[in-house]
Structures are given as structure tokens and as C-alpha cells.
UniProtKB/Swiss-Prot annotation:
<dbReference type="Pfam" id="PF04565">
    <property type="entry name" value="RNA_pol_Rpb2_3"/>
</dbReference>
<dbReference type="Pfam" id="PF04561">
    <property type="entry name" value="RNA_pol_Rpb2_2"/>
</dbReference>
<dbReference type="InterPro" id="IPR037034">
    <property type="entry name" value="RNA_pol_Rpb2_2_sf"/>
</dbReference>
<dbReference type="Pfam" id="PF00562">
    <property type="entry name" value="RNA_pol_Rpb2_6"/>
</dbReference>
<dbReference type="InterPro" id="IPR010243">
    <property type="entry name" value="RNA_pol_bsu_bac"/>
</dbReference>
<dbReference type="GO" id="GO:0032549">
    <property type="term" value="F:ribonucleoside binding"/>
</dbReference>
<comment type="function">
    <text>DNA-dependent RNA polymerase catalyzes the transcription of DNA into RNA using the four ribonucleoside triphosphates as substrates.</text>
</comment>
<dbReference type="GO" id="GO:0003899">
    <property type="term" value="F:DNA-directed RNA polymerase activity"/>
</dbReference>
<feature type="region of interest" description="Disordered">
    <location>
        <begin position="1164"/>
        <end position="1191"/>
    </location>
</feature>
<dbReference type="GO" id="GO:0006351">
    <property type="term" value="P:DNA-templated transcription"/>
</dbReference>
<feature type="compositionally biased region" description="Acidic residues">
    <location>
        <begin position="1181"/>
        <end position="1191"/>
    </location>
</feature>
<dbReference type="InterPro" id="IPR019462">
    <property type="entry name" value="DNA-dir_RNA_pol_bsu_external_1"/>
</dbReference>
<dbReference type="Pfam" id="PF04563">
    <property type="entry name" value="RNA_pol_Rpb2_1"/>
</dbReference>
<keyword id="KW-0808">Transferase</keyword>
<keyword id="KW-0240">DNA-directed RNA polymerase</keyword>
<dbReference type="InterPro" id="IPR007641">
    <property type="entry name" value="RNA_pol_Rpb2_7"/>
</dbReference>
<dbReference type="InterPro" id="IPR007121">
    <property type="entry name" value="RNA_pol_bsu_CS"/>
</dbReference>
Length: 1191
């Protein structure tokens, strides 16, 4: 064993594990939700300021008034986070902006603070609370704005090229070649023009001018031949005709059109990242690399020759002349061109250097033009950019330059919360700007104040719309802490401005070599979203441009040692370096032990000489995400099963008694701490007071080298709160009074946590064996002990609410006095008519008694007399009480009442709101879904009495039997190693940590098993619990960590006798949520036809489905005990006839004797309403599209 292997390592304050890691950790894992918090912080500090700076000043059409936004501040939120959840309001702070109005005529300046709406704040755990619900803003992966070049092959096999200039917002510019070697340009997806037309329009009018700039070549000659415009004016008119067909073109309007499309900073925005990528792509040094220069470069100041003509520019030569190239005062290759009569009047500076075309005998000269390093502040495209991108395109035709891989992470970037919010806020501000301009021109300029000009409605609306209905604003997955953490680290390629599922091809979804250390190759949903929704890798960070960076250890080239200096590299920076694997053997001094090192360079994984290496991986787990890093022996699992394992851990239901895994990976502590489910200390201190609902910590500050006691910090704990998914969210104190805590220590466990570690399931004794065929097809056989001892018992909380509103006929009333309800049904209601806390309820029980006024009918004389005698009481009301829905029930955990009179904020028209929480304790039962961490999932098929389970030689019965046939074909061998190591861990009484790709190997597992006194093969004799006889063969038995998943049979079981019907077809609705029936489909009808079961078939097609009259009469007949009447005509048949008649056909239904059948309507049937007869309200059509979910 390695000296590190088998050492005890402390994870948090309360757990030690024996770690099998061989590689020392050089870098701490970062805070895992930093991607959310840092981005939002940037938005509050910089993003908002940038927005106001962009929009200031707003001037009216005459230029007399100008409105400037000077500064802004955020106030304090009205309610704290818990109150917001309770009251169903948004956690937000008021945004106030300091505005200055300047009147140029009178030189008058007015300043004012303007309230610009409440701005949603991010909680400490990286979520937002919108209308009382916790939501997460998912980061979006989009194409970075830049210039992209690609090659294409036409149908005749001829190779050509295309290029696109993609801005952050604004018009696209595309170049392409055709079969005749002419280069075309498309402006904003319109018809194509020869590219020279665009160059002429920029003010380079004559053929000779263009040839001088771009350099003479056949492609350019072909293009010039195709181009009919001889001058700048003609070119401008031609472009105008293409962009605005049918309008009379003039030179001026063409100039202003082109200006507004490309050169106006308000309309065209490359953003910081676009300018950076553009300058990088068009930079002259990358394009000169390894080319032969065709002119002698001279230092203009000293006259010294830098590079002789005909020199090949390798890395060294380039590095030598780079300072001269980048210094515009030296002027090497810099040219200033004047745009005569073009769109812009200013001169254009470019940098142009001649080289020889590679692989060309005739030594053809090519001009390489760069945009002369445009300043980062210029966010719009410039004529120099256009010239140099056109030049790059012509260079590509001569194999100079490189095409881009659009799936490379150097060309895809993240838009996190801050930027998404900023874009939304920008939309709101620009709508507001329009209003301000209009009001400036209407109102009296002398008396006007800023407040009157500004309408904040559009700003508030755009923010609300973003949080409420954007595809990227999602209801947080709160099933367990891991689900919460993963949701905050999710990267989606979908959403506004991104891809759509249907359009996304195979390449976008595939794993790319640049994902290494940035995006997890394993964790992604199965199904239509595969590869479009990803997870951030564990060590990855996002830089200021939105590119994902991953850390590497730098290798010192002088000494050949791997240093502990960490560099974060983006995907395109990494392309320039050779990177060694994290598990490369090192000498004690940090140099490579072997001459040959396994490493990566771009897409190649091969063996390199150690002298070539530039960097080394930080950790083996930097490849995978937070959830995947929780799978022990990941290296022994097939990737498809590992994907299922990572996804199913997120569906684990928090158990009543959580237990951390015996065999973990060491990530459990980090995931639990950063998820936001635990209570984490903010400061140094000593615990002074611990109780179930709060923990008090006395802060300790260091003053003059001495420790001094400071303020008391109080941490509130959540007890049995309903999570977003209906699981119980409960925190339990972990620390004791007098304990010393440091910042980021865990004070209290959240749900699915034990001793500060993630604990999604339980360690159970598993045998891999069949038992009477009950574990066929991955089914699970379980011992009754797990039910009796509440091993897999979970707590679920449902919330039901009822509101009393004002109706047209009068207000609804919450009361105990409900018509036609016996005293027995009211026994658990208090005097207000609201259920008491602690009552046990079943489905159909009343939770809140409520009556609604019915329409007032004309009273008869007798009724009026009764009214006169007994007063108002006989008023018509109907029972609209809130009842427990089908299949629900449990114990009332809590009741909350909100009254308008008490000053609670309620929606308009609502007087009172009552919320009841029902808690259920669900033991595990047949039909529940279980899984291990290796994608080994199954459904419980049988729960056996403890005495029938097979038992070990010492008499211990096993807990679970799994089918051994589930392992070989699935190739998730990790579960077998976990089984053996888990058993050893139980015997030794030590928890194990086997980190991914750096954990225990077979040898380690065997040695640990021997130390625990087990057989080397991990098998044991088992005895049949029924007969006491031993089984024929020895069986693998061990401890496996098994999880109970959120797919519970209680949520899926459903039955209906009568219920709601669809409005048009009158057929029963479908699905548990609608209390629907089971569809008896086309094939099932064929089956009955084949059997000749005529009466059954007739019933199914009529009275059990949509014969409206028949089903009412049948119901009556069954109730009265009479024989079932003749069925009538199904409603869907009537609908069909009506549809045919609506097409203008005359359709009648005739009997055998050619008499027309009367299709009677229900109304004619003695005014019998089916709903009244069955006591069921008719349901509206619920055949809408299902709501789009993100899995």
C-alpha cells in the first residue's frame, strides 16, 4: 500500500474515514454554489451600474431636456426569507435611483430619488423566493459572440468555406463561397451579395483599392467580375435595395441604414466577450505562426532588421517581434486607409503583413490583415473588423488560418444569473426610455420633475416576467440536499437565445474533449434533453467573460518539478499546453518519476516525454460533477449506469433516520455543507445554547493578539417544513454547548444528513441471490425488519389551502355550519369551521368548512312566511368546503389562517385564507422503487417475514436480496466492490472513503477484507430461513448503500368509479391528477371483439364512457337495484355527426327500416342533469399541453 492509503482522514468535525486516496489534495474544493452567488453579486455591484450608464442620458427629440441616472441603492427587504415563504410574497428589496434632469434652455438642474420597484434578492443559499416559492435561475450555455469560420462541402464534393460574425445583439454578417469560387456576403440573413459590394460601401470604391488592401488573388478577381457596382454610391444603393426591397433607395438612407445595422453602439453590441474573442481571432500573431514571411520587417526607429524576407516564423521568432507588432507607435505593417464617401468618414487603421501561400510553388503573396487591436471599450463592429474578417476568409482559401469548432468550450460561454437578469433589465429600461422621450415632448418643460417622466411599470413587468415565466427560472428541486446543489450548478443549452430540443443535433449533445474539468461527462438527463442539460464539474470556475475555467498545477520547466502553483485555464488557453494526468507518479521532490507521462494535448490522449509537459491535473475528481463524485468505485462502472446512479441520487427521499454510507467518497461532507440545507457557522465562536429550534454562538474576535468574546449570533433551525417536492425539511442540531466552531463548520444537519455528511439512504445487508423467482427483472426482495424498524420510513407533508372570496351574490363564509352535513363529519372542526391540529384525517374529510351563496330565486308565499318567522337563516348557500382529496390523508401538522382584517396581504377579492398541512409517515412497501449508487434500480416485489429470509452462519438474516443477473450485462461492477468493502467496514467499525478515480483497487479491498477476518472472495454460506437447510452454493453477502427513491407507489395508486368528464366528448378524463379513468384503447377493443364479448363491449363504449343519458340511468338502476337499461347513443358519435354537418354534409342516422333515429339531447330527458344525479361538478376540458419540465 501507498503511505497515504488507509490513513484516517477527518471530514468535518464529527466524522473520520479511512481514505484510500493516493494523490495528495493540492487545492480545496471551491464553494460549490459560487456560480450563483458571485454572479448575482456582480449584477448588484457592476451589472446595474452598467445598465444605467448605457441608457444615460435620455434626451428628448429637440435636445433641450436630458435625464441622467447617477446612482442607485437597494433598501432593506420588507420581510425576511421565512416570512416570505409563509406569506407567499417575493423576497425583494426596494431599488431607488438618483435621477438628474437637466434643462439646457434654462440651465436648470433637478435631482430626485425615484423608486424603481422591488428587486428580488438572492438568499444566502443561491435561490430566489418568488411568490413564496423557492426558485433557481439555471445558467445558460450559449455560443459566444465572435467571428466563426467553418468549412463546408457542396453536393458535388467541392470544398468551400463560410464565416459568421455573431454579435451579442444585432445583425449577423455572413461570408461564403460558391461553386464558381466567388465570395459572397449576407447581411442579416438576407440574399447574398458579392463581398466586394460591402467593401465598396465602406468607402473603398475602386477595384484597384480593394486589390491593394486584400491582396491580389483569383477568388477576389472572380468576385470583382461578379460585382456590377463600380463605385461606393452604387454599392450603397445595391445594399439598400437588398435590405429594403421596394423602397426608393438614396445614398444617404443607405448610409444611415448600414450605420444603424452595424456601427451604432445602441443597436449592435458585441459585449466585452465578443470584442475579446474578435480581437483574439483576428490577432496577427496567431495567423503568422509557422508561415513564411514575404517582406522584410524593419524597426522604423532604429532601422534594425527584425525579420528577413523568406523567414519561417516559428514560436521563438514570433515572440521576439511580438512587442513591435503590438506597438502601434512602432507602426510595423500599420496602414491608415481613408473611407471616401463610405458609411463612416473616419480613417481606418489596419495592420497588414505579406506572407507566401503555403504549399504553393509559385510563392504567391498573401496579405494578412488584422484589425489593429481595437480598444476593448468599442462594443460595436468597425470597418477594420470587417476588412480583417474578410481578409481572414480569403486567407482560409489559401490554407492560412483555422476553422472553428463550434462545440468547443472556448466558443461556448455561460450566461449566469447576473447576466440573464441584466439582459432582462435592459429590455425593461429600453421600454421605459421610449416612454420618457414621449413624456418629455408632451409635458411642460418648465414645471416638469423626473418622477413625472419615469414610468417604472415596464421595468417591473420585465423582471416579474423573467422570474415568473422564463424557461431558465425553475422551481427548485428540493427532494434532498444533493438535488438542491445540483440544480444550482446546472448548465442548460435550452432557453431563450439558446437551442431547442428538436433542432439540436448529435454533435452539440456529445461529450467534447474541452469538457474535461469543466462539464461533467456523466451527469445529464436520459431522454430528449440528453447532452443539452449538463452539470458543472467540481473544481470549475467561471471567469469574467463567462468561459468555464479549470485549475491545473504549473510545471516549472527549469527544474521539471510540478509546483503547487495553480492556474485556472479556459478551454482555448488549455489548447496550447500539454497536460499530465493527476495520477502521474511523482518523486518526493515533485518531479515526474517516469520519463514517459500519460497526458493530453487538444483531443489526443497519449504518452508524452516528461520534458514536454506544461501542466498537471489538480485532482482526479476534477472531471466529474458534485453528484457523480459521490459514487464510490465509479471507475469500475459502465458510464451509462454511472449516469443513472448520479441522477437517481438526486431522487432520494429524506429518511426519518438518515445514515451516512459506510463506503463513501469523501465528497459527502462538501456536498452537504455547500448545498444550503445545513446550518453553517458564519463566524468563529463558542456554542452557548442549543435547542431544537435555535443555536446561539458567542463570537470570538482577535484583538491585539488576544481572543475576546463578541456578540451573540443566533441561528434559526427549520423544523418539519414542507419542501418544494413535498418531502419533510427538518434540521437537527449537531453541536454541543461549549463546542468551538470555525466559519463554514456545520452546526445543524439538514434533511438527508448525518454528522455533517450527505446521507441519502441506509447501509443494509445485501445478498446477491435469487429466491423463488421473486427478484426476476431487477425486482427487490426485502426483509420485514426494514419495515418494522422504520429503516426506510420517510415523512411527507402536503399543503392544502382554501380561500373565502367576495362573489357577485355576496361573500363566501368560513363556518362550521354546513348544509346537509352530519355532526360526525364536523367532529374535528373548531368553532370557526377549521380542522384542529393533530386530528387524523382520511380522504373526503372536511378540512375547512365553507359556504358560498347560491343565486337568489323567487320565493313562494310559504317560504316568505318562513323567512318572516325564522329570520335570514333560510338563505340559499351551497357547500364548497375544502376536503381531503382521494388517496391523501394523515395527521394535521399545522394550520395557518390569514385575515384581511388582521392586515395580512391577500390577493384582491380574498377575505380569508386558510392553509392546512397534512403529514404522512410512509413506511416502505411493495411497489416502492429502490436503487443503489451504481444505477442498479429495482422495484420491491415482496416483503418477507424476518424468519423466512436467508441467514448467515452467525444467525443474522439478510435485509435485501438482489438478482445476481443484474450485474454482468450492466457492467456496473462498482456495486460488488462496494458490497465487499462495506462488509469489511462494518466488521472493522470504520467508515471508508474511496474517492473517484483514486480509490481502493482490488488489492486494497482484499487486504481490508482479510484484516476484517472475511473470506478473500467475500462469499459465505447462507441458510434457507424456511427450512434451515444451507443453500447449494456460497453467496456474496455484504453491506450496500441503498436509497429509497421519490417514485413511491402511494403517489401512483389510483382508482375511479365515477368522476369528472371532458366537456366536448363527455368521456372520462385521464390521469391521477384529474381523478380520471383508465383508457380502454383501440387494441383493447379489438381484444373484446375477438372474444365476441358483445355486452361487455357495448357497456365499455356507451354507459361506462360517453353515453350521457345512459350512464345516469344506469347509475340510478344500480342504486335502486333494477336491471340495467338499454344504452343510448355515445356523445362522441353526436360530435362526429356535428363535425360532418359543419363541413356542409347532410348526415342522418337511419334504422334498419330507413327511419331516422332521433338523437335526443339530455335536456329533453326530464331536465335531468348528469352532474346533479352523480353529485359531480362537470370539469372543463383539460387537454392542454403538459407543462414543460426540465428533466
Amino acid at each position: 500500500m501507498n503511505e497515504l492509503t488507509g490513513q484516517l482522514v477527518q471530514y468535518g468535525q464529527h466524522r473520520q474515514r479511512r481514505s484510500f486516496a493516493r494523490i495528495k489534495e493540492v487545492l480545496e474544493l471551491p464553494n460549490l454554489i459560487e456560480i450563483q452567488t458571485a454572479s448575482y453579486e456582480w449584477f448588484l455591484e457592476e451589472g446595474l451600474r452598467e445598465m444605467f450608464r448605457d441608457i444615460s442620458p435620455i434626451e428628448d427629440f429637440t435636445g433641450n431636456l436630458s435625464l441622467e441616472f447617477i446612482d442607485y441603492s437597494l433598501g432593506d427587504p420588507k420581510y425576511d426569507v421565512d416570512e416570505c415563504k409563509e406569506r407567499d410574497v417575493t423576497y425583494a428589496a426596494p431599488l431607488r435611483v438618483k435621477v438628474r434632469l437637466y434643462n439646457k434652455e434654462t440651465d436648470e438642474v433637478k435631482e430626485q430619488d425615484v423608486f424603481m420597484g422591488d428587486f428580488p434578492l438572492m438568499t444566502e443559499t443561491g435561490t430566489f423566493i418568488i411568490n413564496g416559492a423557492e426558485r433557481v435561475i439555471v445558467s445558460q450555455l450559449v455560443r459566444s459572440p465572435s467571428v466563426y469560420f467553418h468549412d463546408k462541402t457542396d453536393k458535388n464534393g467541392k470544398k468551400g468555406f463560410g464565416a459568421t460574425v455573431i454579435p451579442n445583439r444585432g445583425a449577423w454578417l455572413e461570408y461564403e463561397t460558391d461553386a464558381k469560387d466567388v465570395v459572397y456576403v449576407r447581411i442579416d440573413r438576407t440574399r447574398k451579395l458579392p463581398v466586394t459590394v460591402l467593401l465598396r460601401a465602406l468607402g473603398f470604391g475602386s477595384d484597384q483599392e480593394i486589390i491593394d488592401i486584400i491582396g491580389d488573388n483569383e477568388y477576389l478577381r472572380n468576385t470583382l467580375e461578379k460585382d456590377n457596382s463600380e463605385s461606393t454610391e452604387k454599392a450603397l444603393l445595391e445594399i439598400y435595395e437588398r435590405l429594403r426591397p421596394g423602397e426608393p433607395p438614396t445614398v444617404e438612407s443607405a448610409k444611415s441604414l448600414l450605420y444603424s445595422r452595424f456601427f451604432d453602439a445602441k443597436r449592435y453590441d458585441l459585449a466585452n466577450v465578443g470584442r475579446y474573442k474578435m480581437n483574439k481571432k483576428l490577432h496577427i500573431k496567431n495567423r503568422l505562426f509557422n508561415q513564411t514571411i514575404a517582406e522584410t520587417l524593419v524597426d522604423p526607429e532604429t532601422g534594425e532588421i527584425l525579420v528577413e524576407k523568406g523567414t519561417v516564423l516559428d514560436r521563438r521568432t514570433l515572440d521576439k517581434i511580438l512587442p513591435y507588432l503590438e506597438d502601434s507607435s512602432k507602426g510595423i505593417g500599420f496602414r491608415t486607409l481613408s473611407q471616401v464617401g463610405g458609411v463612416l468618414e473616419d480613417d481606418v487603421t489596419i495592420q497588414s503583413i505579406k506572407i507566401y501561400a503555403p504549399k504553393d510553388e509559385a510563392q504567391k503573396e498573401i496579405n494578412i490583415i488584422s484589425n489593429a487591436y481595437i480598444d476593448e471599450e468599442v462594443k460595436n463592429i468597425t470597418p477594420a473588423d470587417v476588412l480583417s474578417s474578410v481578409s481572414y476568409f480569403f486567407n482560409l482559401l489559401y490554407q492560412v488560418g483555422a476553422t472553428d469548432d463550434i462545440d468547443h468550450l472556448g466558443n461556448r460561454r455561460l450566461r449566469s444569473v447576473g447576466e440573464l437578469l441584466q439582459n432582462q433589465f435592459r429590455i425593461g429600461l429600453s421600454r421605459m426610455e421610449r416612454v420618457v422621450r414621449e413624456r418629455m415632448s408632451i409635458n411642460d418643460t418648465a414645471a416638469i420633475v423626473p418622477q413625472q417622466l419615469i414610468n417604472i411599470r415596464p421595468v417591473i413587468a420585465s423582471i416579474k416576467e423573467f422570474f415568473g415565466s422564463s424557461q431558465l427560472s425553475q422551481f427548485m428541486d428540493q427532494t434532498n440536499p444533493l438535488a438542491e446543489l445540483t440544480h444550482k450548478r446546472r448548465l442548460s443549452a435550452l432557453g431563450p437565445g439558446g437551442l431547442t430540443r428538436e433542432r439540436a443535433g448529435f454533435e452539440v449533445r456529445d461529450v467534447h474533449y474541452s469538457h474535461y474539468g469543466r462539464m461533467c461527462p456523466i451527469e445529464t438527463p436520459e431522454g430528449p434533453n440528453i447532452g443539452l442539460i449538463n452539470s458543472l464539474s467540481s473544481f470549475a470556475k467561471v471567469n469574467k467573460f463567462g468561459f468555464i475555467e479549470t485549475p491545473y498545477r504549473r510545471i516549472d520547466h527549469e527544474t521539471g518539478q510540478v509546483t503547487d502553483q495553480i492556474d485556472y485555464l479556459t478551454a482555448d488557453e488549455e489548447d496550447n499546453y500539454y497536460v499530465a494526468q493527476a495520477n502521474s507518479p511523482l518523486n518526493p521532490d515533485g518531479s515526474f518519476a517516469n520519463d514517459e507521462v500519460v497526458g493530453r494535448f487538444r483531443g489526443d490522449n497519449t504518452v508524452f516525454n516528461k520534458a514536454q509537459m506544461d501542466y498537471m491535473d489538480v485532482s482526479p475528481k476534477q472531471v466529474v460533477s458534485a453528484a457523480t463524485a459521490c459514487i464510490p468505485f465509479l471507475e469500475n462502472d459502465d458510464s451509462n449506469r454511472a449516469l443513472m446512479g448520479a441522477n437517481m441520487q438526486r431522487q432520494a427521499v429524506p429518511l426519518l433516520n438518515p445514515e451516512a454510507p459506510f463506503v463513501g467518497t469523501g465528497m459527502e461532507h462538501v456536498d452537504a455543507r455547500d448545498s444550503g440545507a445545513a446550518v453553517v457557522a458564519k463566524y468563529d465562536g463558542i456554542v452557548e445554547h442549543v435547542e431544537a429550534r435555535s443555536i446561539h454562538v458567542r463570537r470570538i474576535e482577535v484583538v491585539d493578539g488576544k481572543e475576546v468574546k463578541g456578540d451573540l449570533t443566533k441561528y434559526k433551525l427549520q423544523k418539519f417544513i414542507r419542501s418544494n417536492q413535498g418531502t419533510s425539511y427538518n434540521q437537527r442540531p449537531l453541536v454541543k454547548v461549549g463546542e468551538r466552531v470555525k466559519p463554514r463548520d456545520i452546526l445543524a444537519d439538514g434533511p438527508s444528513m448525518e454528522k455533517g455528511e450527505l446521507a441519502l439512504g441506509r447501509n443494509v445487508l445485501v445478498a446477491f441471490m435469487t429466491w423463488n423467482g421473486f427478484n426476476y427483472e431487477d425486482a427487490v426482495i426485502m426483509s420485514e425488519r426494514l419495515v418494522k424498524d422504520d429503516v426506510y420510513t420517510s415523512v411527507h407533508i402536503e399543503e392544502y389551502e382554501s380561500e373565502s372570496r367576495d362573489t357577485k351574490l355576496g361573500p363566501e363564509e368560513i363556518t362550521r355550519d354546513i348544509p346537509n352535513v352530519g355532526e360526525d363529519a364536523l367532529r374535528n372542526l373548531d368553532e370557526r369551521g377549521i380542522i384542529r391540529i393533530g386530528a387524523e384525517v382520511r380522504d373526503g374529510d372536511i378540512l375547512v368548512g365553507k359556504v358560498t351563496p347560491k343565486g337568489v330565486t323567487e320565493l313562494t308565499a310559504e317560504e316568505r312566511l318562513l323567512h318572516a318567522i325564522f329570520g335570514e337563516k333560510a338563505r340559499e348557500v351551497r357547500d364548497t368546503s375544502l376536503r381531503v382529496p382521494h388517496g391523501a390523508g394523515g395527521i394535521i401538522l399545522d394550520v395557518k389562517v390569514f385575515n384581511r382584517e388582521d392586515g395580512d396581504e391577500l390577493p384582491p377579492g380574498v377575505n380569508q385564507l386558510v392553509r392546512a398541512y397534512i403529514v404522512q409517515k410512509r413506511k416502505i412497501r411493495v411497489g416502492d422503487k429502490m436503487a443503489g449508487r451504481h444505477g442498479n434500480k429495482g422495484v420491491i416485489s415482496r416483503i418477507l417475514p424476518e424468519e423466512d429470509m436467508p441467514f448467515m452462519p452467525d444467525g443474522t438474516p439478510v435485509d435485501i436480496m438482489l438478482n445476481p443477473l443484474g450485474v454482468p450485462s450492466r457492467m456496473n461492477i462498482g456495486q460488488v466492490l462496494e458490497l465487499h468493502l462495506g462488509m469489511a467496514s462494518r466488521y472493522l467499525g470504520v467508515h471508508m472513503a474511496t474517492p473517484v478515480f483514486d480509490g481502493a483497487n482490488e488489492e486494497d479491498v482484499w487486504e481490508t477484507m482479510e484484516e476484517a477476518g472475511m473470506n478473500r472472495d467475500g462469499k459465505t454460506i447462507l441458510y434457507d430461513g424456511r427450512s434451515g437447510e444451507p443453500f447449494d452454493n456460497r453467496v456474496s453477502v455484504g453491506i450496500m448503500y441503498m436509497i429509497k427513491l421519490a417514485h413511491m407507489v402511494d403517489d401512483k395508486l389510483h382508482a375511479r368509479s365515477t368522476g369528472p368528464y371532458s366537456l366536448v366528448t363527455q368521456q372520462p378524463l385521464g390521469g391521477k391528477a384529474q381523478f380520471g379513468g383508465q383508457r380502454f384503447g383501440e387494441m383493447e377493443v379489438w381484444a373484446l371483439e375477438a372474444y365476441g364479448a358483445a355486452y361487455t363491449l357495448q357497456e365499455i363504449l356507451t354507459v361506462k364512457s360517453d353515453d350521457v343519458v345512459g350512464r345516469v340511468k344506469t347509475y340510478e338502476a344500480i342504486v335502486k337495484g333494477e336491471s340495467v337499461p338499454e344504452p343510448g347513443v355515445p356523445e362522441s358519435f353526436k360530435v362526429l355527426i356535428k363535425e360532418l354537418q359543419s363541413l356542409g354534409m347532410d348526415v342522418k342516422m337511419l334504422t334498419v327500416n330507413d327511419e331516422e333515429v332521433e338523437l335526443r339531447d339530455l335536456d329533453e330527458e326530464e331536465d335531468l342533469q348528469p352532474a346533479d344525479a352523480l353529485n359531480i361538478a362537470p370539469q372543463p376540458d383539460t387537454e392542454e399541453e403538459p407543462v414543460e419540465s426540465f428533466e
